[in-house]
């Protein structure tokens, strides 16, 4: 059988390559260019054959027993979830997959904290694929976007507070908190009150505010947010004048002058 006849037969039936007593890289490339999945008919494909197959069909990686590192990286960069089908990927392939999409962490058995950090820094919600994330990982995810708290089953207090500081609305995404937690949240971000006003005793809020406004290092934003908090009906200006530190009163004056 001449070359042309062989190519024609391979085109119609790529599995025919297994019947050839002698094959070469050109023939192997020919069948994987038609469909990357045809690499399953090739024993020990060369790096170039792997490359052609992967570029054609990234998920054909599942048919490669010993994928070349460079090819594995090309594969996961092209399609992040192809990591799931790669046999025994090395650390570099895993890392590149996670750099492409944090969700790739779900295909890594017992990922290191370093890989977890990489994942949540890339995509905050990839933390939902991490079982019992450490506090550092929780904080990194929340640093990326506060809504990450929504996907953490048992967030640490520090993680909860970080989310709430970022946005008071974060309290809507925290499933487990108690009164002591709420006091800390309000102390850090008065805007939390917007989302829990109907379920909290106003006197508790007032007590927290008395402690907060007397702090000399109180932030300008906290005072401004307090003054603009419509849901809390009270004489806020006189409250700051009566209970506020020197700095709080200065912020109040500056705020009134800017109106």
What does each model-identified segment do?
Residues 1-259:
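Alpha-helical scaffold segments
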């Amino acid at each position: 059988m001449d070359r042309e006849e062989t190519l024609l037969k391979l085109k119609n039936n790529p599995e025919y390559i297994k019947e050839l007593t002698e094959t070469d890289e050109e023939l192997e490339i020919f069948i994987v260019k038609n469909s990357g999945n045809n690499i399953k008919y090739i024993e020990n494909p060369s790096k170039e054959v792997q490359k052609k197959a992967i570029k054609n069909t990234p998920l054909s990686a599942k048919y490669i027993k010993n994928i070349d590192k460079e090819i594995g990286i090309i594969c996961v960069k092209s399609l992040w979830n192809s990591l799931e089908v790669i046999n025994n990927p090395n650390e570099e392939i895993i890392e590149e997959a996670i750099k492409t999409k944090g969700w790739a962490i779900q295909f890594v058995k017992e990922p290191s904290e370093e890989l977890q950090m990489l994942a949540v820094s890339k995509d905050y919600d990839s933390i939902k694929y991490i079982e019992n994330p450490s506090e550092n990982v929780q904080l990194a995810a929340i640093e990326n976007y506060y809504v990450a708290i929504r996907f953490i089953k048992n967030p640490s207090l520090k993680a909860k507070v970080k989310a709430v500081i970022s946005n008071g609305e974060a309290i809507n995404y925290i499933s487990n908190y108690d009164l002591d937690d709420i006091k800390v949240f309000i102390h850090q971000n008065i805007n939390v009150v917007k989302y829990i006003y109907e379920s909290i005793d106003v006197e508790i809020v007032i007590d927290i505010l008395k402690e907060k406004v007397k702090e000399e290092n109180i932030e300008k934003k906290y005072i401004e947010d307090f003054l603009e908090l419509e849901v809390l009906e009270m004489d806020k200006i006189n409250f700051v004048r009566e209970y506020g530190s020197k700095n709080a009163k200065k912020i109040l004056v500056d705020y009134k002058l800017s109106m």
